[in-house]
């Protein structure tokens, strides 16, 4: 973090589920806007074909910048709550010092290092407290565990998604999505991704990108060209008329979400 993230606008994506997909969406939105972000993602976004890059301006094929030594100020990182090392039991994400942080969701996980849910909540509380007051927390407004974490103390502005009093979606025919902030219509997203979880991921990415300077309309346009991540509802073929998908979901709630 000292060598790569220092003096950069870090956008960190945390949560039990959806980190990889949301990080990929966010990196793609910024890249589509010509901001050429660096990123470190726990999967391979098909828009990039790689899981990490430093983020020099020419990394973006649509960038108009000409200085080949100029580094993008933006860096998107998948922010995991797993411990840092055997000699540092703090969660990895406390080292990233983000200016923009997404809190996708929170439930018990990593039973090998956390005794219970409250132990994970404590780490998320530490994470929330390092985000500056000129930053932004983008939080899932439907998650009671995240609400409990934020109630412990937070001095950063918060924008919620998934609730009528914040950012939310309405599904229309042909897999199109109307996007709203409160009751104000923001635009319509036409895309091929399925599921409520991906709509929530998209909202989080749009809000975070907006904080970094990308208008919502531009973010929606970018997501229309988003190709998802390998092994995230990846279509592998058809057998006897049945479409076969490959997905990385590994715990009960994630598997349930994918099946739904």
Locations of the language-model features?
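Glycine-rich nucleotide phosphate-binding loop and flanking beta-alpha elements
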Residues: 1, 19, 83, 109, ...
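Walker A (P-loop) phosphate-binding motif
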Residues: 1-45
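Acidic, Mg2+-coordinating active-site environments of NTP-dependent enzymes
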Residues: 5-8, 27, 32-35, 47-49, ...
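Short catalytic-loop micro-motif centered on adjacent basic/acidic residues
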Residues: 12, 39, 76, 137-138, ...
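Switch II (G3) loop of P-loop NTPases
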Residues: 74-84, 244-250
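Conserved ATPase-coupling elements of RecA-like P-loop NTPase cores
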Residues: 86-89, 112-114
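AMP-binding/adenylate-forming catalytic core of the ANL superfamily
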Residues: 248-260
